[in-house]
Amino acid sequence: DAPVILHNLPDILDINNQIRLLQDVGVSIQRTSPHDIILQANAVDTQYLQSDEFLQRCGKLRGSVMLMGPLLARFGQAMIARPGGDNIGRRRLDTHFLGLEKLGGKILYDSQRQVFSISAKKLQGTYMLLDEASITGTANILMAAVLAEGTTTIYNAACEPYIQQLCH
């Protein structure tokens, strides 16, 4: 529920679409400069998160996968459409799913709707070894793990500076 301040956001379509998606979910976003924003997520509309409109928008934005960890941690469930968006080669979602499962998430895929559902009664910290040092996979797992009970240790985690910043 605490405000989050993000600095140096590029003014690009994917970032702006992700901001609009967060606003539609109920996140209050205040732009403090052309590249800085303050986010306040104390009025998230959990019903909207299950709507066809939300799922359609997720399907058009690869970055929507980054909502899974935080939504699972805060609300015990998340749904996203199979992410589309850019076409920059093969980027698997396995790391995201395997890490969230290790924390206690149960993942289902509806092939007809192309929707992933994940739920957990309680997330539990654990040791995990990632098959690949995925930047977004590591970030998603970290964002879920902060609200898990116990300690989470991730081996073969991505170690880019922004991942290190996320840890602080």
Give the positions of each predicted feature.
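Structural preference for solvent-exposed beta-strand-turn elements
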Residues: 1-168
